């Protein structure tokens, strides 16, 4: 049993669990990239670049809104 423990210890030292990518493609793991991937107001289909606000209501996810 002690040989198994020694083998396990050596394996964990050589290949730590932090080196294994678990869910690297999840946006929650990369908040900076998630913020860049969000649709900004300027790229929203209802955004009016002349008025710098949305043409329709704010409930559609476009900010800043025309009051």
UniProtKB/Swiss-Prot annotation:
Residues 1-19 form the signal peptide. The keyword Transferase does not apply. Residues 20-52 form a propeptide. Keywords: Amidation, Cleavage on pair of basic residues, Disulfide bond, Hydroxylation, Neurotoxin, Secreted, Signal, Toxin. Disulfide bonds join 53-65, 54-62, 58-66. The modification 4-hydroxyproline is found at residue 64. Its main location: secreted. GO terms for cellular component: extracellular region. The keyword Glycosyltransferase does not apply. GO terms for molecular function: ion channel inhibitor activity; toxin activity. Has been found to be hydroxylated and amidated by Han et al. (2006), and to be unmodified by Ju et al. (2022). It is found in: Secreted. Expressed by the venom duct. The modification Cysteine amide is found at residue 66. Negative results: does not show inhibition on Nav1.4 and Nav1.8 sodium channels. Intracranial injection into mice does not elicit symptoms. Belongs to the conotoxin M superfamily. The cysteine framework is III (CC-C-C-CC). This is Conotoxin mr3d. It comes from Conus marmoreus.
């Amino acid at each position: 049993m002690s040989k198994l423990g020694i083998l396990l210890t050596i394996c964990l030292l050589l290949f730590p669990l932090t080196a294994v990518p678990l869910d690297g493609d999840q946006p929650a793991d990369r908040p900076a990239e998630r913020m860049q991937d969000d649709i900004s107001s300027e790229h929203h289909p209802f955004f009016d670049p002349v008025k710098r606000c949305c043409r329709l209501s704010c409930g559609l996810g476009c900010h800043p809104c025309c009051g």
